[in-house]
Amino acid sequence: MKVLVLFSVLFLTLFSYSSTEAIDEFDSDAEDDMLSLMANEQVRAKACTPRLHDCSHDRHSCCRGELFKDVCYCFYPEGEDKTEVCSCQQPKSHKYIEKVVDKAKTVVG
């Protein structure tokens, strides 16, 4: 009986060792495949429109500020013809929140 228990423990040890070898081999192949796919990946991000620049061509292209994304505001200037002018601007509420966060960072550390 002791011999049977000894052989079963030995068999289970060898089986678990061989299965982990196979799993490690499979994982390394999967990692190599993923790395080769990532190497072929192209950067798809388009250039953002800086603050206070014209965003009439794409109203969702404004750059991010420190915490929030700027918003494209459109308006009609006074005294000119009825052409719409759009520019990326930071909303006042976002500006105040960023100031509070900056003050909190300096106080905390």
UniProtKB/Swiss-Prot annotation:
<comment type="function">
    <text>Enhances the high-affinity desensitization of human P2RX3 purinoceptors.</text>
</comment>
<keyword id="KW-0732">Signal</keyword>
<keyword id="KW-0960">Knottin</keyword>
<keyword id="KW-1015">Disulfide bond</keyword>
<dbReference type="Pfam" id="PF10530">
    <property type="entry name" value="Toxin_35"/>
</dbReference>
<protein>
    <recommendedName>
        <fullName>U4-lycotoxin-Ls1a</fullName>
    </recommendedName>
</protein>
<keyword id="KW-0108">Calcium channel impairing toxin</keyword>
<feature type="disulfide bond">
    <location>
        <begin position="74"/>
        <end position="86"/>
    </location>
</feature>
<dbReference type="InterPro" id="IPR019553">
    <property type="entry name" value="Spider_toxin_CSTX_knottin"/>
</dbReference>
<feature type="disulfide bond">
    <location>
        <begin position="55"/>
        <end position="72"/>
    </location>
</feature>
<keyword id="KW-0964">Secreted</keyword>
<dbReference type="GO" id="GO:0005576">
    <property type="term" value="C:extracellular region"/>
</dbReference>
<keyword id="KW-0800">Toxin</keyword>
<feature type="region of interest" description="Knottin domain">
    <location>
        <begin position="45"/>
        <end position="88"/>
    </location>
</feature>
<feature type="propeptide">
    <location>
        <begin position="23"/>
        <end position="44"/>
    </location>
</feature>
<feature type="region of interest" description="Linear cationic cytotoxin domain">
    <location>
        <begin position="89"/>
        <end position="108"/>
    </location>
</feature>
<feature type="disulfide bond">
    <location>
        <begin position="48"/>
        <end position="63"/>
    </location>
</feature>
<keyword id="KW-0872">Ion channel impairing toxin</keyword>
<dbReference type="GO" id="GO:0090729">
    <property type="term" value="F:toxin activity"/>
</dbReference>
<dbReference type="GO" id="GO:0005246">
    <property type="term" value="F:calcium channel regulator activity"/>
</dbReference>
<feature type="signal peptide">
    <location>
        <begin position="1"/>
        <end position="22"/>
    </location>
</feature>
<dbReference type="InterPro" id="IPR011142">
    <property type="entry name" value="Spider_toxin_CSTX_Knottin_CS"/>
</dbReference>
<feature type="disulfide bond">
    <location>
        <begin position="62"/>
        <end position="88"/>
    </location>
</feature>
<comment type="similarity">
    <text>Belongs to the neurotoxin 19 (CSTX) family. 05 (U4-Lctx) subfamily.</text>
</comment>
